[in-house]
Amino acid sequence: DQGNNVFDDYNLKLGMGDMGTLSFSGNSSSGSGVDKLKDIVPNAYTPVYEATDATDSGLIDTSGNNQSGQWGYDMSVGDLAISASYNPEPAENKTAESGFALVYSGLMDGLELSAGYFDDGDEAENDTLGVKYTMGAMTAAYQMTKVDYAATGSTDQDATHIGVSVAINDQLSVSAGQQSI
């Protein structure tokens, strides 16, 4: 590359109306599958896990969700949003990765229930459950995530995220959050 390190980022999305959206992710995040539920807890500026160190500990996709070459499919059926991802070859000599996310918003206005799962095809398996409620300018959410790493030397993580944000006006929001791992 003659010393020119270039980051090539490309995505392809095909909108199919009521049949949903099919996507392909080149070298960036796909936004499908568990990526939809990576962090549902509201924040005004920086999520709790970003303020402590460089590692995004306790998030559903931290154990190896490789988004390069990943296919995604998103659609809504009534009050249920469905998102799936599939990566046939995330890396050399690796088995296929798959994940999904479900968000149900039909119980009452402003309430969303979510569930997601990711499997790297080997040993890493992650799951998450969450609830999010929005009323006027206030949003509150609670999310539990379980991260099982494939590597034997890595410590698995059970994380709980909770937060609330209030939009004071169009230019100012205030939030508080906590993460326990």
Q: Model segments located where?
A:
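Outer-membrane beta-barrel proteins
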Residues: D1-I181
